[in-house]
Amino acid sequence: MRSMKAIIEYLLKQALINLQQSGEMPIDLEVEIKVENAKDPSHGDYATNLALVLAKPCRQAPKVLAERLVAVIPADPSVEKIEIAGAGFINFFMRSTARSLIISEILNKGKEFGRGNLGQSQKVLIEFVSANPTGPLHVGHGRGAAFGATLGNVLKAAGYDVTLEYYVNDAGRQMNILAVSVWLRYLELAGEPIVFPTNGYKGQYVYEIAQEMWSEQGNQFVHPWISVVENLPADEPEGGDKETYIDAIIARAQSLLGKDGFANFHQHALKTVLDDIKDDLQAFGVRFDSWFSEQSLFEDGSIEKGIQALKDRGHTYEREGALWFRATDFGDEKDRVLVRANGQTTYFASDVAYHWNKYDRGFDRVIDIFGADHHGYVTRIKTAVKALGHDESALDVILVQFAILYRGGDRVQMSTRSGSFVTLRELREEVGNDAARYFYVARKPEQHMDFDLDLAKSESSDNPVYYIQYAHARICSVLRQLKERGLKWDKDMGLKNLDLLEQQHETTLISLIARYPEVIQSAAASCEPHQLAYYLRELANGLHSYYNAIQLLCEQEQLRCARLCLLESVRQVLNNGLAILGVSAPESM
């Protein structure tokens, strides 16, 4: 069954064709038909500004054009009347019978209601979170996790074939810093008088990993502290450069431990942290289809293949012993190094290889979800994709602002290396998964977010997730009361008497639940899950108003059964929408 908005869009399209065929409108005119939900019930159910959009290219007054459009709109049993308002807006009033049909559809489809075929099984890869496996996820990562998972659910509901992927940065410098941090704590456990580097990872988890290494490996990797720091440059507290110092101490560790010894610390730290990240995300309801290793790009030759693909297309050149990508040819501010003069590939080369790999796996569309601090990567990634021969429109890069946590009115600073951060796990334990999942997606991803812990934990109408869940629980409570009072709910009787639902609260609710498929399609088309979060709050508000104003379990059986059909439809839509957000739908609260 087509949505009411889809019906109106079709009718308007036919009206345009009629005007073009009659010569009253240019035959080559193309326009996007936009139909919006009417904000004021007195203006109908839906409205369009099509006449205002077409006025200039058609050289006609908007109101005159609106009259011509309305005159040739085909008749449809779903539409009661059409009115022209203001400067040329066209308002549609739907028949109550058409609105009521949505209740029957919801009850028949259940959990499948709202699912569509916008995506037509197009293969989409969403890469998100992808935090360096150098420590636990913090509350900033949590927003990207919730957003990516919810976007995946929205796209699946809209008919896309979605794969969720976490890119594991297991081949970079940060992993070496973690490995050497663990080794230094290991030396500390052995009694060595270490001075921990300014740029090392300082969290409690580093001690715990070091303790595991000490318990499993004994003292076989112990070296005197003097041999570790001998002839090294100064660290920052001694007037040196912390980056130079940490690189030097990594090189010393690799020399003293040997390739296999250093790899032992590297792999143990990686596995421990990555397992913790996986457990954390699993508990948060975020499940990935693929965990893609950066190291695999080196092992399977993807790095070389990606670079070669750019070479073959003539998009590289050599300068001062390094291999460069002609990024400026594709709109970047400067060219980018792929291979340094010493033969080492750059992070950018890994990015090129990874995206070459994504398209090589047959995905039609790629969505990268980055933290806002990665804004500088957007242009260079897009230029690489374009240079590799792919349509730039097949890549979407969405930047998610990190959430800022406030406790007692104070902002909590977060830094992985300093070890002073609030983890996602701690946040979940304090406010619960449901509040975290909802709050994280309740705003546009590019908007800054202040996470109010007090609000997230409150049991009031000010807390949106509580308000929505309470609406679901209230409906379940009514159904329980039905049994307790020995009353019947005959669904067939209710469906035959939906015309009895004439109260303003009832017609409002019917209009709201009819919008659900449109919300899913719109959220998917724009990659904006917050639209669903807003909608569910609006639906919950409609339910609470109805609950407070109307005697739901009335004595008149036909009306009672009709109202229960409406209530069950609202409950189903709330359930379906909350499931997409990754939020539970409790039956009692």
Curated annotation (Swiss-Prot):
The gene is argS. GO terms for biological process: arginyl-tRNA aminoacylation. InterPro entries: aa-tRNA-synth_I_CS, Arg-tRNA-ligase, Arg-tRNA-synth_N, Arg-tRNA-synth_N_sf, ArgRS_core, DALR_anticod-bd, Rossmann-like_a/b/a_fold, tRNAsynth_Ia_anticodon-bd. The keyword Aminoacyl-tRNA synthetase applies. Belongs to the class-I aminoacyl-tRNA synthetase family. Gene3D superfamilies: Arginyl tRNA synthetase N-terminal domain, HUPs, Isoleucyl-tRNA Synthetase, Domain 1. Its main location: cytoplasm. It is an enzyme of class 6 (ligase). Pfam families: Arg_tRNA_synt_N, DALR_1, tRNA-synt_1d. This is Arginine--tRNA ligase. It catalyses: tRNA(Arg) + L-arginine + ATP = L-arginyl-tRNA(Arg) + AMP + diphosphate.
